C-alpha cells in the first residue's frame, strides 16, 4: 500500500510538470516482459528527453513571442519561415504605432509591472480562447505567466491589445488641458519610480535561489535525521526479533531433548525439566521485548511516512531526489521488518507444534499408566516406575500373561487407529497441499506485484529526475532571455524618460519664472498689509501682557499661601499619625520632631506658633498614649477602683480594705451604662461613674470618660490619677492638633477661592 501511495504521488507530479503542456503517461499495471536489453530503454529516454527539450524551447519561444511583439519581430527577421509558424499559432502581428518624440498635451509614459500586464492581457486572451476552444494554448499561457512571475518583478512591455489601446488614447484629443505642468512632472516621477533596474532583478533572483537552496538543505537534513532515527529503531527491532527467534528455537530444541530422553529418571530428569522452564521464561521475555520493539518501530515508520508526505506537500524545488531516496530507504526498512516478523511467526508456529506434541505424549503416558493400574491392581505400586531390567525377576507368570495379552490388544487397537489415521491424514495432506499451492501462488503473485511496483517506482523516479532536469534547464534559459529583454526594455525606457525629463524641465522652468514674478508682486503687497496689522496686534498684545503679569503676581501670592497651607496640613497629618502610631515595645512616640516641622514650615505665622507652644512639654519629649492604649489601660484601672470603692481620703483600716474588696466581689453592677443627660447626687457613685466612663470609652468619647473619672473620690481617684493625667495630656494635644487641622483647611479653602476668582 505504501508503494501504491508513492507511485500515485509520483504519477500526479509527473502529469502536472512542464506547466501542463506535456503529459507523461504512467506505466500500465500489466506490462509484458521483453528480451531487449537496457540500451534500447536508455536510447528511448535520451530521445524522449531531446524531444521534450526541443518542444519546450519552441513552446517557450512562441509564448514569449505572444507576450512581446518586439521579440516576435526580431525572431521573424532572424529565423526564416518563423513568421508563418507564428501566423498559424498566434495569428497576425498587431500593428504598433511609433512613439512620438514630443507628445502634445499628453501625460507621461506609463510603465506597467508584470502583475498589471497580466491583469490587462488576461481578458482578450481568455475571450479568444473561449471562441476558438483551444485548451492547450490556455495551459501554455498560464505556464508562461508562472515562469515570468518566478523571474521577479521585471519590467515588461504591455500586451499588443493594451499597446494598441494606449496608442489610440494618445492620438485622441486630450480633455485635461487645464492641468498644471507640476502634476505632469509628479506623474512622470512616480512612473519612473516603478522601474526596477536589472541589478535589483538579478539580486532578487539570487536571493530567491538562495532561499530555495536553504529550504532544500533544511528539508534534506530533516529527512536524513528522521531516516537515521527510524533506521536505528528498526535495527533494534530486527535485533529483538532475531533474539526472539533464537529463544523460541532454543526452547523447542530443549523441549524435544527432554521428551526424547524419556529413560532418564530422578534428579537428572527434574533438572532437565527445570532447564525447559528456564528456556520458556527466556522465550516469553524475548517475545514480549520483540513485540514492544515492533510497536515502537511501527510508530517510527508512521512518523517517517508523515514527514515524507509533508515534504511532498511543501513542493520545494530540487527536493524530489531527496524525497525519492527517503521513500526507497523507508520501503527497504518496511520489507526487512516484514521478513524478520515472518521468521518470528514461523518459529512460533514450529514451537507450537512441539508443545502440542509434548502435551499429546504426556497424555498418552498418563493413559498408559491408568490402563496398567486397572489391569494389575494387586501389584506393588512402585514397580511401574522401574526399568525393564529391574522388573525381569519380580513379575509372576500370570502378571506377564496379563501384560502380554493387554499388549496384543493394545497393538491391534493402535494398528486400527494407525490405519484410520493414515487414511484421514492422507486426505488432510491432500487438502493441505492444495491450500499450500494456493498460498504459494498468492505469495508469488504478491511478490511479483511488489517487484513490479518497485521497478515502476524506480522508472518513475528516473523519469521525474529527467523531467526536473529538463524543466530546470528550460527555466534557466527562459530567465536568461527574460533578463536580456528586461535590460533592453529598461534602456529604451530610460532614454525615453530622459527626453521627456528635459522637455518637462524646460516647460517647468519657464512656467516657474512667470509664477515667481507674479508671486513677488503679490508678496510685496501682502507683506505691507501684514506689517500694519502686526503693529496693531503688538500694541494689543502688550496691553494684555501687562494685565497677565498682574494676574500672575496675585496668583503667585495665592499659590505661596496655598503651598504653606498644604505644608501645614501635611505636618499636622504627620503629627496625627505619630499620635495614633503605637506598638507593644514603644507605646508612645515623641512628638517633638513633628511639632518642630510645623514650627519651621509656619515660622511667620503667629497663630500656629502660639498653638504649638501650648502643647505640653511632656508630649514633645515622651509622647502621648493613643486612645486604644488608654482604653486597654482603663480596664485595669477600673478593676482596681472597684476594689477600693469604699475607701475615702483618710485611707481607713485594713478591715475597711477587706470589706471594700469583698463588696467588689459580691456586687455585679453593669460594666457599661449609658450616662444620663443630667447627673443627680445619687448617680455620683464609684460603680456608676466607672460604668459611665466605660460606656464613653467604648463609644470613642474619651473626653466625657475623663470627666466621669474626674468625679471619683477617695482611694478610687488616687488609683485612677495616673490614667486621668495621661488622658488629659492626650486630649489637650488632640485638641491642639484638631485646631491646627481646621486652620490649615480654612487657609487652603481661602486660597482655592482666590485662585478660582
UniProtKB/Swiss-Prot annotation:
The modification Phosphoserine is found at residues 112-113, 222, 387, 389. It is found in: Mitochondrion inner membrane; Mitochondrion. The keyword Acetylation applies. One of its GO terms (cellular component) is mitochondrial intermembrane space. The modification Phosphotyrosine is found at residue 506. Residues 34-45 are mitochondrial matrix. The keyword Transmembrane applies. Residues 199-231, 279-317, 397-442 form a coiled coil. The chain crosses the membrane at residues 46-65. The modification N6-acetyllysine is found at residues 210, 221, 450. Its main location: mitochondrion. It is a single-pass membrane protein. Residues 66-757 are mitochondrial intermembrane. Belongs to the MICOS complex subunit Mic60 family. Component of the mitochondrial contact site and cristae organizing system (MICOS) complex, composed of at least MICOS10/MIC10, CHCHD3/MIC19, CHCHD6/MIC25, APOOL/MIC27, IMMT/MIC60, APOO/MIC23/MIC26 and MICOS13/MIC13. This complex was also known under the names MINOS or MitOS complex. The MICOS complex associates with mitochondrial outer membrane proteins SAMM50, MTX1 and MTX2 (together described as components of the mitochondrial outer membrane sorting assembly machinery (SAM) complex) and DNAJC11, mitochondrial inner membrane protein TMEM11 and with HSPA9. Component of the MICOS complex, a large protein complex of the mitochondrial inner membrane that plays crucial roles in the maintenance of crista junctions, inner membrane architecture, and formation of contact sites to the outer membrane. Plays an important role in the maintenance of the MICOS complex stability and the mitochondrial cristae morphology. This is MICOS complex subunit Mic60.
